[in-house]
């Protein structure tokens, strides 16, 4: 499996406040970014997988909403996560 609990804890430890902090926007954005990159690679091979394409668009929307929330609440954390993950703005 591409995303196991250890991998999630790694993302939360690196971008969240602790290993079990799954609620912080930074941890969720990092997790969504990993899933988005994985689905993008899948769609390069399977071009007609429309269900995966829809789920990718939904994930991008979720990440966008979290980024907008973070930008409204704390611009410093927003800039850090954008630079750290290499997300275009």
Curated annotation (Swiss-Prot):
The gene is rpsO. Keywords: Ribonucleoprotein, Ribosomal protein, RNA-binding, rRNA-binding. One of its GO terms (biological process) is translation. Belongs to the universal ribosomal protein uS15 family. It comes from Azobacteroides pseudotrichonymphae genomovar. CFP2. GO terms for cellular component: cytosolic small ribosomal subunit. The keyword rRNA-binding applies. GO terms for molecular function: rRNA binding; structural constituent of ribosome. The keyword Transmembrane helix does not apply. It comes from the Bacteria. Part of the 30S ribosomal subunit. Forms a bridge to the 50S subunit in the 70S ribosome, contacting the 23S rRNA. One of the primary rRNA binding proteins, it binds directly to 16S rRNA where it helps nucleate assembly of the platform of the 30S subunit by binding and bridging several RNA helices of the 16S rRNA. Forms an intersubunit bridge (bridge B4) with the 23S rRNA of the 50S subunit in the ribosome. InterPro entries: Ribosomal_uS15, Ribosomal_uS15_bac-type, uS15_NS1_RNA-bd_sf. This is Small ribosomal subunit protein uS15.
């Amino acid at each position: 499996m591409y995303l196991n609990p250890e991998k999630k804890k790694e993302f939360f430890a690196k971008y969240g406040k602790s290993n079990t902090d799954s609620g912080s926007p930074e941890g969720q954005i990092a997790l969504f970014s990993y899933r988005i990159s994985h689905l993008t690679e899948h769609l390069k091979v399977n071009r007609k997988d429309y269900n995966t394409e829809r789920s990718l668009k939904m994930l991008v929307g979720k990440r966008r909403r979290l980024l907008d929330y973070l930008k409204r609440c704390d611009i410093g954390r927003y800039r850090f996560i954008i630079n750290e993950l290499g997300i275009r703005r």
